[in-house]
Amino acid sequence: ALFIIIYSYQLLFVPVSLLGRAVERAKRKKGSQSKPPALLRYAVLICARNEEAVIGELIDSIKSQTYPIELVTTFVLADNCTDATAEAARGHGAIVYERQDTKHVGKGYALGYLLARIGEDYGDIFDGYLVFDADNILMPDYIERMNEMFAGGKYEIITSYRNSKNYADNWISAGYGLNFLRDACCHNHARSLLGTSCFVSGTGFLFSRRIKNKIGGWTYHMLSEDIEFTADQITSGVQIGFCRAAEFFDE
């Protein structure tokens, strides 16, 4: 009973999200006269462990974006791999680093290592950093939509609409798919409409160069490093935005 009471406020998010979608559709029908956004430079960060079977599909979906491809650089960290993840990623055109470290294990350590190597080799040339898991696939306009919001200057951290890649496979994948829907539509979308901060959930998010420099790369190493990152930024006064138009698929 206590659990239900604590989480009952989330019931408010459902009508807020539904009403918000209706308002957004009406605005799209009217059209917008806003000027085109600035075209910013992005680094895509992918930390992968034994993902040779799927990583090529993600890289291909990045290369097929409607956003100018010369402004997007894809970096892969083959982390403690025992398969051909590095070779597969290179074969699809990514810049690949490799790490073997059985003491500092986990995505948080991998992201920190990858950002440090990028800083050594490329300096601070990227305006924003996009984070994905190796089994993701992006809609063709994903980066274009994220850039529209990011270039507006209101948000330095933006999360996006995570959809299911394999909803119909079994009851477990269906459960994950429904959870993705709940996070996107009933939580982050509603929170953004109410003017409160959204949350980052593992993959499909963007953070600015200033945020990277402020925290010193990536310093979150808990098992749920995404929630650690979210909590740290919100308590520091940073509001996290949600871009519903930027859709990607996850397993």
Where are the model-predicted features located?
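Cell-envelope/extracellular polymer assembly enzymes that use nucleotide-activated donors
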Residues: 40-43, 73, 228
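Acidic helix N-cap motif at the loop->helix transition within catalytic regions
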Residues: 56, 83-90, 98, 141
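Catalytic donor-sugar/metal-binding loop of nucleotide-sugar-dependent glycosyltransferases
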Residues: 195, 221, 230-249
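Short beta-strand-to-loop acidic/aromatic patch adjacent to the donor-nucleotide binding site
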Residues: 122-137
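Short, acidic, metal-binding catalytic loop of nucleotide-sugar glycosyltransferases
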Residues: 60-71
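N-terminal membrane-anchoring/stem segments of glycan-assembly enzymes
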Residues: 1-38, 89
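A conserved acidic beta->alpha catalytic loop
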Residues: 77-86, 101-103, 137
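Long helical/loop segments within the catalytic core of UDP-sugar-dependent glycosyltransferases
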Residues: 98-100, 104-123, 140-223, 234
